[in-house]
Swiss-Prot record:
Keyword Cell inner membrane (UniProt): no
Residues found modified as Phosphothreonine: T174
InterPro entries with a match to the protein in the record: ATPase_NBD, Chaperone_DnaK, Heat_shock_70_CS, HSP70_C_sf, HSP70_peptide-bd_sf, Hsp_70_fam
Pfam families linked to this entry: HSP70
Coiled coil: none
Any one GO molecular function term: ATP binding
Biased composition (Polar residues): 586-598
Protein name: Chaperone protein DnaK
Top-level taxonomy: Bacteria, Bacillati, Bacillota, Clostridia, Thermoanaerobacterales
Length: 612
């Protein structure tokens, strides 16, 4: 069995890790960084860019750059580039492909299996979408695990004794809080809560709005209507937020942000940490509710918690740290890297599943209650939130009308009392029920949640034994045909990426060959005949012309001819130098031989002079 990698597929950054020699190791990407921006872009020429290279060109190519796609996982959102629409699963798969390729380059072997993390508060559709993204990227997703749980694994791998810990995970786009009990290799989640639409992106948006509103007041222009200006604001907001984690004031300087009839306009303002905290105070305060909810569900008080772990880049914001300290009455633990802990935990779980690590048991929970719609549009829960998974529960229902021969099972996930206020996971029909007065038929509905948190539902008429089983595939999930099509397209992109890399290598080799040829010609000087120099110069020119075009075979062919021409000259000079016997008859050879002899004589004479 090959290596199983652990992937933290984040909203703004992603990270990949693997177990090596019993220790989890973060895998650096091709650019040498330990995290990769979760950004995908398409150039006007149709080339696909992923990661840092995509993020760098966002300002000049905002319409074709996709960021924070994770916020749309499990929805029917689509990204339109030219005439093609991409689902969140496809864009996420492109990021996963990049992480997979970086892992393969690091490990020196093919990678086909992974554990991928998701926010604890992700619903079934979002989890299924993440699994589909893995498949499209060419990965068998062995397990989907919750990000806070993964972070707890990273923290608790080498810890002894029993501890109750709280993981406060505030990333780029999602917020989770989980309470766990760890000890003797068992990691048991007691409760989880969160908000799938709260994170660092929202902090950035507050700065963007503050800048744009002030600019509009002063100049009457709304920069949010200009895609390129808006992208510059986004970049500046993110930089300012990061700087204010360590500084108390930062300067935002954006020259030539736009122009009107009176000339170019600029932004040059200072943002203090106090003002930034005022802008985001309600967002940070909104994390308090889920923290209290998780504590209540776990039946614990803040004083019962031994350690508080801060995970996700947004927990570097001082106001966030102060808020957590205020709620919990203790300093948060800062002994783990908030950007890497989740990927490290995923790598540990990957090693557990592959048998590389033993004596670790992970007991996670379902974040939201599951049930069905019953008479009057009521949501009837079958599995309560924070139930340990995997789990299976059944409940018996009956018909609502006389002689009803079929029932529609409307499967939902959420906490609200009315069905319409919860998330629909899917619908299916159990038919063939014998006509009978209402209340007589006995229909058993069974919910099964696997270790990935993915739901399977079945309904059975106990009178006839007739049953209907489904794995939830809501309207936002992909069909098998769509997944296969996307897998094939992903392979094409992979092939394009491979060809692009090969093209760059061939071009670099050709450039290097020209440099070496010109340098060697200069070094050899008169040892080369004029005819040889002319031939080499001609071949150099041919390589240069080929490099101006896009025909890779032409570049390879021209490079090969230049190499052969040089090999011919080098061989002649080498043989001539080695086989020289003084009385050569060929004038060119004799001339070359004399030069060669003179060089050696000069060297010896210098040494003799030094000795005198």
């Amino acid at each position: 069995m090959g290596k199983v990698i652990g992937i933290d597929l984040g909203t703004t950054f992603s990270c990949v890790a693997v177990m090596e020699g019993g220790q989890p190791v973060v895998i650096p990407n091709a650019e040498g960084a330990r995290t990769t921006p979760s950004v995908v872009a398409f150039t006007k020429e149709g080339e696909r860019l992923v990661g840092q290279v995509a993020k760098r060109q966002a300002i000049v190519n905002p319409d074709r750059t996709i960021m924070s796609i994770k916020r749309h996982m499990g929805s029917d959102y689509k990204v339109k580039i030219d005439d093609k629409e991409y689902t969140p699963q496809e864009i996420s798969a492109m990021i996963l492909q990049k992480l997979k390729a970086d892992a393969e380059a690091y490990l020196g072997e093919k990678v086909t299996q992974a554990v991928i993390t998701v926010p604890a508060y992700f619903n079934d559709s979002q989890r299924q979408a993440t699994k589909d993204a893995g498949r499209i990227a060419g990965l068998e997703v062995l397990r989907i695990i919750n990000e806070p749980t993964a972070a707890a694994l990273a923290y608790g791998l080498d810890k002894e004794g029993n501890q109750k810990i709280m993981v406060y995970d505030l990333g780029g786009g999602t917020f989770d809080v989980s309470i766990l009990e760890i000890g003797e290799g068992v990691f048991e989640v007691l409760a989880t809560s969160g908000n799938n639409h709260l994170g660092g992106d929202d902090f950035d948006q507050r700065i963007i709005d503050w800048l744009a509103d002030n600019f509009k007041k002063e100049h009457g222009i709304d920069l949010r209507n200009d895609r390129m200006a808006l992208q510059r604001l986004k970049d500046a907001a993110e930089r300012a937020k990061i700087e204010l984690s360590s500084a108390t004031v930062t300067n935002i300087n954006l020259p030539f942000i736009t122009a009107d009839a009176t000339g170019p306009k600029h932004i040059d303002v200072n943002l203090t940490r106090a003002k930034f905290e005022e802008l985001i105070s309600d967002l940070v305060e909104s994390t308090v509710g889920p923290v209290n909810q998780a504590l209540n569900d776990a039946g614990l008080k803040p004083s019962d918690i031994d350690k508080v772990l801060l995970i996700g880049g947004s927990t570097r914001v001082p106001l966030v740290q102060e808020t957590v300290k205020k709620i919990m009455g203790k300093e948060p633990h800062k002994g783990i890297n908030p950007d890497e802990a989740v990927a490290i935990g995923a790598a540990i779980q990957a090693a557990v599943l592959s048998g590389e690590v033993k004596d670790i048991l992970l007991l996670d929970v379902t974040p939201l209650s599951l049930g069905i719609e019953t008479l009057g549009g009521v949501f009837t829960k079958i599995i309560e939130r924070n139930t340990t998974i995997p789990t299976r529960k059944s409940q018996i229902f009956t018909t609502a009308a006389d002689n009803q021969t079929s029932v529609e099972i409307h499967v939902l996930q959420g906490e609200r009392p009315m069905a319409k206020d919860n998330k629909t996971l899917g619908r299916f029909i159990l038919s063939g029920i014998p006509p009978a007065p209402r209340g007589v038929p006995q229909i058993e509905v069974t919910f099964d949640i696997d270790a990935n948190g993915i739901v399977h539902v079945s309904a059975k008429d106990l009178g006839t034994g007739k049953s209907q089983d489904i794995t939830i595939t809501s309207t936002t999930n992909l069909s098998e045909e769509e997944i296969q099509r996307m897998i094939n397209e992903a392979k094409q992109y992979e092939e394009q990426d491979r060809k692009k890399k090969e093209e760059i290598e061939i071009r670099n080799k050709a450039d290097s060959l020209i440099y070496q040829a010109e340098k060697t010609m200069k070094d050899l000087g008169d040892k080369m005949t004029q005819a040889e120099k002319d031939e080499i110069n001609k071949e150099i020119e041919n390589v240069r012309k080929a490099l101006e075009g896009s025909d890779i075979e032409a570049i390879k062919s021209a490079s090969e001819k230049l190499s052969q021409a040089f090999y011919k000259v080098s061989t002649r000079i080498y043989q001539q130098a080695g086989g020289q016997t003084g009385g050569a008859t060929n004038t060119d050879s004799a001339g070359q031989g004399t030069t060669q002899d003179n060089v050696y004589e000069a060297n010896y004479k210098v040494e003799d002079d030094d000795n005198k």
